[in-house]
């Protein structure tokens, strides 16, 4: 079973490499993991950093797909990057990752495979969270399996992908698969990050606030996050269109589960 995992980022190559490396070096079978990075056309920093990693080949059988979007969408249209990746990923599942996330446990990929294998014929979504998240019952980082993508024909219908997929699952009555993948979410703007693991308490440095709330947005500040699966913008037109996309995806998935 092949796992695809993607990162969207903008001119934060240091954080991206740190995040990517933590997953690459802790995977059990990198030959069955597809690493994907997508960046903007004017973001040479990110593109060149990934090209350099690919030339180094510091772990056998690793190649990172280095994608460039057709235009700069920014955080205002974050789902566009994800849906571009959706058209080309080759794995049996796709995870959306942040560049401020570090993987902590070895064989994380095998844990995901073991969780997903019994469900390949059904559309399922996967929920992960950082060990330091305040909302540990929630799913900060989400993934979908191939069947889910084939049914909806997209990764997300709006930029709040975690909320979008989570609420689809909740409305369908489908709980997320929760593989035991331990990650720390460094969360921009925090001086320190505290978390517990294996009965030990850790304190690590956070990441500096880049003035944009950590988001690759085109506007001075990111739009308000309403935690609503149908809306992540102040534009009413986009709200209406987002609602249509959500309802359409829900109906398709509902019919799948009725079969």
Q: Model-derived features: where do they sit?
A:
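Active-site nucleotide-sugar/metal-binding loop of Leloir-type enzymes
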Residues: 82-93
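C-terminal catalytic/acceptor-binding lobe
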Residues: 159, 163-259
């Amino acid at each position: 079973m092949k796992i695809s995992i993607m990162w969207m980022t903008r001119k934060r190559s240091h954080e991206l490499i740190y995040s990517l490396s933590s997953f690459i070096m802790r995977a059990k079978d990198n030959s069955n993991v597809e690493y994907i990075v997508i960046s903007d056309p004017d973001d040479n920093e990110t593109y060149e950093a990934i090209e350099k990693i690919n030339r180094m080949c510091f772990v056998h059988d690793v190649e990172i797909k280095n994608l460039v979007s057709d235009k700069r969408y920014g955080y205002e249209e974050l789902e566009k990057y994800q849906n571009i990746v959706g058209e080309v990923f080759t794995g049996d599942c796709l995870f959306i990752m942040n560049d401020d996330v570090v993987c902590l446990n070895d064989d994380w990929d095998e844990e995901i495979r073991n969780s997903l294998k019994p469900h390949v014929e059904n559309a399922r979504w996967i929920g992960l969270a950082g060990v330091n998240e305040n909302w540990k019952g929630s799913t900060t980082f989400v993934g979908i399996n191939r069947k889910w993508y084939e049914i909806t024909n997209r990764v997300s219908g709006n930029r709040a992908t975690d909320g979008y997929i989570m609420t689809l699952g909740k409305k369908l009555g489908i709980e997320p698969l929760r593989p035991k993948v331990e990650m720390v979410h460094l969360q921009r703007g925090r001086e320190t990050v505290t978390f517990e693991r294996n009965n030990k308490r850790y304190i690590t440095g956070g990441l500096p606030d880049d003035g944009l709330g950590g988001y690759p947005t085109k506007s001075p500040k990111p739009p308000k996050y309403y935690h609503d699966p149908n809306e992540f913008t102040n534009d009413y037109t986009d709200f209406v269109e987002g609602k249509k996309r959500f309802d359409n995806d829900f109906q398709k998935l509902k019919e799948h589960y009725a079969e």
